[in-house]
A protein has these predicted regions:
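Short, surface-exposed beta-edge/turn micro-motifs
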Residues: 94-95
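Conserved small/polar residues in nucleotide/adenosyl-binding loops
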Residues: 150-151
């Protein structure tokens, strides 16, 4: 799909080459290895599995406890994992996003913890965008680069 030049509110939008959706940014080699191992283990490569295991793989804590978070036999998330002793503030954010991307899960009574205001307030935020992009590839394309032309007036 070709993007066109557009002017909005005095800003000239210059289309950039659309990002190749196969370019995945990982937090570490361990993250990348885990991601591909989990997809192979499940035999699924759809947006549900990809976004879930991408999130879970970001942190060593969540990678080490994937069996506490996901039932591989039934292919279901385990919400009780949010309250286990191994969880940290960061791993709980990863878990909440992974669960939400899996099936829209939001913990009753703790809905505010699943808002971007709470979840993205950590160093994992750049990787959260990648997970969202995996879940919704049809909607997550690179936006055109904005170039101001006010100096031309």
């Amino acid at each position: 799909m070709a993007l066109e030049n557009v002017t909005i509110c005095g800003v000239f939008l210059v289309p950039e080459k659309e990002r190749n959706m196969s370019e995945i940014r990982f937090s570490s080699k361990e993250h990348e290895k885990f991601f591909y191992q989990m997809l192979a283990k499940c035999g699924k490569h759809d947006s549900y599995y990809s976004s879930f295991f991408y999130c879970v793989g970001i942190s060593e804590d969540t990678r080490n406890h994937v069996d506490r978070m996901f039932d591989f036999k039934e292919r279901l998330i385990k919400p009780e994992a949010l309250h286990e002793g191994w969880q940290t503030g960061g791993s709980a954010r990863l878990t909440r996003l992974a669960f939400n991307l899996w099936n829209g899960y939001v913990e009753k009574g703790e809905e505010s913890l699943s808002t971007p205001y709470e979840m993205f307030d950590c160093g994992y935020a750049p990787y959260f965008y990648e997970a969202i992009r995996m879940k919704y590839p049809e909607y997550c394309r690179e936006l055109p680069q904005a170039v101001s032309y006010t100096h031309l007036r």
